[in-house]
Amino acid sequence: VIETMRGHNLARVISRGAALPNTGVPGVIAGFGKERVIHAPAAGEIHCISKISDIVEKDQILAWIGDVPVRASLTGVLRGIIRDGFTVPKGMKIADIDPRKEQKKNCFTISDKARCIAGSVLEILLSEGVMPYEAPGRFSGITAD
């Protein structure tokens, strides 16, 4: 198990026990927390109009679920949106917005949180022998080509 909650224990490998329970509350960015997350207003197949990295305005239609519009909860950069054509239940998290429009570049990079968790996944793969460690900086089957 890998801890995914931000804070001192982020990405800690837990060999016994469980990670902290999901609070359902995203981290606060520029004073916005839960307002950044958009949940499906209805069940059905989603048809996206907007894409990741689009600058969106509050109440702008981002997608449709059947004949129900999915609107932006605030103005900012669309940091994530569920894949077009996916069937969603009502209430499912389907998108999130970063209120910092100047941070559009973050849509194309790996976050600190993702990088930390990926490092822990690699640690587990190596320690369990799933991914053999051959020499410093080199892994089995990976070439520079």
Tell me the role of every PLM-derived stretch:
Residues 1-145:
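Well-ordered secondary-structure scaffolds
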